[in-house]
């Protein structure tokens, strides 16, 4: 069982602490800011531009990272065990990663319990939402330059649980992270707008309502603009439950409007 874990992935950091492996963690990267206990182990280590010497200085017996760089090969050459948790595409990917981390850290039972609790909470959130005759259409905003996501992403999976339609799916393109035009978004007049750029960029219901032409969209005119914590929306860890519950609340709000 590893006793000196270094985490270079904010998502993996959240998973490690949620399965009770936090005491085995000696260092986390500069983006790992949750839970509070992880902040006590914050360092200048970077998951984006990892420095293998700086990592090795913590004498880790397990390094967890997202596999987005060639760090794995470098750690292998130094004989340092490492675990890769690549960006999840589905809920099953998330559950599998939590279970794998549980096995890798000696917390199999805690990991299984966490997965069971997550499944139950997500099921409950989805079941709590009244079925609407017409599936609402949404726009998910990654940043103020109108980058969005298609349904082909993990974020899209979250909205897909509720049968929501994504306006970005109609864009022709090869990327799952398309940049939409303001004209396109306004012309689509989405029923719901989800802002994942409040922490980074200060976007809010008010700032969106003040954009020229946006006040006429269905979402803005009905007050159906919702803020999602940037971190929660960009990580595929235990707090995805919070994300699902927020979307459930948004759906309940829209259902009330259509019933009203």
Regions found by a protein language model. Give the residues of each.
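Short secondary-structure boundary segments
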Residues: 9, 67, 144, 192, ...
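Extracytoplasmic substrate-binding proteins
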Residues: 4, 71-147, 168-170, 188, ...
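Stable alpha-helical elements in mature extracytoplasmic
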Residues: 11-15, 21, 51, 67, ...
């Amino acid at each position: 069982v590893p006793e000196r874990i270094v985490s270079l992935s904010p998502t993996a950091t959240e998973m490690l602490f949620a399965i009770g492996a936090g005491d085995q963690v000696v260092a986390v990267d500069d983006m790992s800011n949750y839970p509070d206990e992880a902040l006590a182990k914050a360092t200048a280590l970077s998951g984006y531009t990892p420095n293998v010497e700086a990592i090795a200085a913590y004498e880790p017996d397990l390094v967890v990272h997202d596999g987005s760089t060639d760090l794995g090969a470098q750690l292998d050459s130094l004989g340092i065990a490492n675990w890769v948790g690549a960006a999840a595409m589905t809920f099953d990917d998330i559950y599998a990663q939590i279970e794998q981390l549980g096995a890798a850290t000696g917390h199999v039972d805690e990991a299984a319990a966490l997965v069971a609790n997550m499944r139950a909470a997500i099921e409950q959130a989805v079941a709590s939402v009244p079925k609407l005759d017409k599936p609402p259409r949404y726009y998910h905003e990654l940043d103020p330059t109108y980058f969005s996501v298609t349904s082909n992403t993990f974020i899209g999976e979250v909205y897909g649980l509720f049968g929501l339609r994504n306006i970005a799916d109609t864009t022709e393109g090869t990327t799952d992270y398309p940049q939409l035009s303001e004209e396109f978004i306004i012309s689509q007049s989405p029923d719901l707008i989800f802002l994942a750029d409040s922490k980074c960029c200060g976007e809010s219901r008010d700032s969106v309502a003040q954009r020229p032409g946006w006040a006429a969209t269905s979402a803005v005119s009905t007050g159906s603009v919702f803020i999602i914590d940037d971190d929660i929306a960009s990580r595929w860890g235990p707090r995805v439950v919070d994300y699902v519950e927020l979307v459930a609340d948004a759906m309940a709000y829209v259902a009330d409007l259509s019933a009203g």
